[in-house]
Amino acid sequence: RQHVGLEGYAFNAKGKVFNIAENTGILKYKLWQQRIPLTVISPTEIKRLATGKGNADKELMTRQFRIDTGLNLKQELTPKSSKVINPVSDIVDSYYVCKELWYKIIDF
């Protein structure tokens, strides 16, 4: 069965928040039209699920991802960066959204 998970809005986000909101609205409408269920998980909840801390920074999230999966995305995708940047942080967040959906929806 189909089910979509999304990370909720970060209320302190900067940049193109209107574009993000616009596109998310369209996505939600299309999912509703197709009767595909949607679960939105807040950024704080994703961080708490991954690390036990709702205010975990990108470094801690990436470190936990490496512990959980054995993959060093930072080294593989952005070896020249001293900080965790995209796409690494987006992939890490997506992993934990999927993991949470698995436990809530698939695994019962």
Located regions from the model:
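Phosphate- and other anionic-substrate recognition elements at nucleic-acid/protein interfaces
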Residues: R1-F108
